[in-house]
C-alpha cells in the first residue's frame, strides 16, 4: 500500500473514534408514572432525540422495543417491537397495543382494554445502530372513589 492510502485510512479511523464519543441518542418520558383503570386505555410516554450532526446518524433504521419488567426486575417480558414498517406484538398484548406515532420521534405505546395483569413497570428502548437508550414508565391502577 502506498503511504498516501495509509494516511487516508488513519485519518478515517481517527474520525470514527472522535465522532463516536458521547451519546447521540436520548430517550425520555414526560411522566414516570401514569394511571388508568381496568378496561380503559392508556398511553405510556416515550420520546427520543437524536443528534443529527453525529457521524452515521440517520443511516440506521430506528428500532423501538417495549418490554414489561417483572416485579423482581430480573426478567423482561416482550410486549411490542417496531422497526420501520415492521411491527410485532407479543402474548396477551396482541391486538391491544400500538405506537401512538404523534411524530417521528414519538415512541409512546398505547395499550387498550387494560387488564389487571397489565399494571406494572414498562421499559421503552430505542436503538439506532450501536446507540441505544431506555426509560422506565410505571402503569398504576387508578383508584375508585365513592
Residue ranges and their predicted role:
Residues 13-28, 67-72, 90, 103, ...:
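Flexible inter-domain hinge/linker segments at boundaries of tandem extracellular adhesion modules
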Residues 30-58, 62:
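Extracellular ectodomain surface segments
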Residues 35-37, 55, 86, 100, ...:
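Amphipathic alpha-helical protein-protein interaction segments
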Residues 39, 45-49, 67-69, 100, ...:
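Structured beta-strand/turn binding interfaces of compact recognition modules in eukaryotic regulators
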Residues 49-94:
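N-terminal V-set
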Residues 94-138:
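Ligand-binding face of N-terminal immunoglobulin V-set domains in extracellular IgSF glycoproteins
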